[in-house]
Amino acid sequence: MNDVNVQVIVKSPPSEIWKIWSNFAEAPLWDTDVRQCQLDGPFQAGTRGKCVLKNGLNMPLKLEAVSLHESYRNSARLLWIDLEFDHRMRRLSADETHVVHSAKISGPLSFLYRGLLRKALTVAMTTALDNLCTLAEQRAIGAPRHGKTATPLHLV
């Protein structure tokens, strides 16, 4: 069972969202709760890395699963709490994608903080997903459209 679920419809193809997700160094552009993120290897299952949060905490993470252009899941440990973040998308049309981010909270002391963390994560993840949506839509507008060519105008 997920503790937090947020979702949005993005007016962008999945490829734009995937480019954003898979570039961990750019995570602060859309996830404003992080100051810096890095992976110590390629964007694939098993790769470890870390994010430094705005409050200065280091959050080690591991990519648990990566399904190209569909989803990825990472685990993280923050103090004595285990977090699992799931990022999924489903193409609705050529230029529209359903994106879902969810989080699970676990660990020996998670029951003490679950309510507070659930509220904080809901706010943070909603903001992050809104920012991701805006960024993907801006990039999609600037990206060349394949299969479509401009129609030249002739002055009469």
Question: Which residue stretches match the model-derived regions?
Answer:
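Glycine-centered tight beta-turn/hairpin loop motif at sheet-sheet or coil-to-beta transitions
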Residues: M1, K54-G56, W80-D82
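Hydrophobic ligand-binding cavity/cleft-lining segments
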Residues: M1-Q38, L153-V156
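Intrinsic-disorder/low-complexity, polar/charged segments enriched in Ser/Thr/Lys/Arg/Asp/Glu/Gln
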Residues: D3-Q7, R48, N58, S71, ...
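Hydrophobic/aromatic beta-strand elements that line small-molecule binding cavities or substrate pockets
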Residues: V8, M59-A65, E84-R91
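Short, hydrophobic/aromatic-rich segments at coil-to-beta transitions
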Residues: F43-K50, S67-N74
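Beta-strand/loop substructures that line and gate deep hydrophobic ligand-binding cavities in soluble
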Residues: R77-T127, T134, A143-G147
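Charge-rich (especially acidic), low-complexity segments
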Residues: P144-V156
